[in-house]
Swiss-Prot record:
Any one GO biological process: cholesterol efflux
Pfam families hit by this protein: Apo-CII
Expression sites (tissue/organ): Highly expressed in the liver. Moderately expressed in the ileum, jejunum and ovary.
Gene Ontology molecular function, alphabetical: lipase inhibitor activity; lipid binding; lipoprotein lipase activator activity; phospholipase activator activity; phospholipase binding
Protein name per its UniProtKB record: Apolipoprotein C-II
PANTHER family assigned to the protein according to its UniProt record, in alphabetical order: APOLIPOPROTEIN C-II
Family: Belongs to the apolipoprotein C2 family.
Lineage: Eukaryota, Metazoa, Chordata, Craniata, Vertebrata
Length: 101
C-alpha cells in the first residue's frame, strides 16, 4: 500500500519537474523553443510510458489475485452472520414488544 503512494508521489514530482524545466526553457527563442519543446514532449511521453508500465508491473506483483477471493469470502460470511443475528434480534424485539398474547 505504501509503495503505491510512493510511486504516485514520484510520478507527480517527475511531471512537475518537467513542467518547471519546460517553463524555464520557453523563455528562449521561438525557433529553438519549438524543436526543444517537441524533444521534451517526446521525452516526457517516453518517461511516462516507462513509468506507467513499471507501475503496472509493480501493482501486479504486489497485489495477489487470491486477495480478491479472500475479501469476497469474508464479505459473504460476515453478511450471512449479520443477517442471521439481525433476524434473531428483530424476532426478540418483536416478541418483547408484543408480550405474551
Amino acid at each position: 500500500m505504501g509503495t503505491r503512494y510512493l510511486l504516485v508521489l514520484l510520478l507527480v514530482l517527475l511531471v512537475l519537474g518537467f513542467e518547471v524545466q519546460g517553463a524555464h526553457e520557453s523563455q528562449q527563442d521561438e525557433t529553438t523553443s519549438s524543436a526543444l519543446l517537441t524533444q521534451m514532449q517526446e521525452s516526457l511521453y517516453s518517461y511516462w510510458g516507462t513509468a506507467r508500465s513499471a507501475a503496472e508491473d509493480l501493482y501486479k506483483k504486489a497485489y495477489p489475485t487470491t486477495m480478491d477471493e479472500k475479501i469476497r469470502d469474508i464479505y459473504s460470511k460476515s453478511t450471512a452472520a449479520v443477517s442471521t443475528y439481525a433476524g434473531i434480534f428483530t424476532d426478540q424485539l418483536l416478541s418483547m414488544l408484543k408480550g405474551d398474547s
